[in-house]
């Protein structure tokens, strides 16, 4: 072990490692170009979250969403839910490659959006299995097991007890 530089007489500033960076070296990444995906049949998958169940058909197209016969803007007016639904397509950079037809049943908007995200991610790995690591890393292939806890008798809600009086 050597002493710190200020106490080491043999150490000079010239001995320190110097990193040389070339100015003309560019870091621009070329835009990823994907070949159009060819699938022989529509890919059908199911996603679930809370009480919501979503059945998705993925077909090659222009990035159009049809949810229970309505557009994504009509079905999910909340931008957060729209962004949540589109996130698997954004992750694999295929937002304009597929049309998505979905049938959503049960639950509320948040549960349906989560179920739709899972179904889209599952459909994408059926089309292109090499996208699986990116989707898995982003957490899109994990089924969220959380659901509403049941109400117990003797309690007002699942865990809320009636007021207790000591005397």
UniProtKB/Swiss-Prot annotation:
Gene3D superfamilies, per the entry: 3.30.230.10
Protein name: Small ribosomal subunit protein uS9
Family: Belongs to the universal ribosomal protein uS9 family.
Protein source organism: Nocardia farcinica (strain IFM 10152)
GO molecular function, one term: structural constituent of ribosome
Basic and acidic residues bias (residue ranges): 143-152
InterPro entries: Ribosomal_Su5_D2-typ_SF, Ribosomal_uS9, Ribosomal_uS9_bac/plastid, Ribosomal_uS9_CS, Ribsml_uS5_D2-typ_fold_subgr
GO CC annotation, single: small ribosomal subunit
Region (Disordered): 136-167
Keyword Transferase: no
Top-level taxon of the source organism: Bacteria
Key words, A-Z: Ribonucleoprotein, Ribosomal protein
A matching Pfam family: Ribosomal_S9
Biological process per Gene Ontology, one example term: translation
Composition bias type Basic residues, residue spans: 153-167
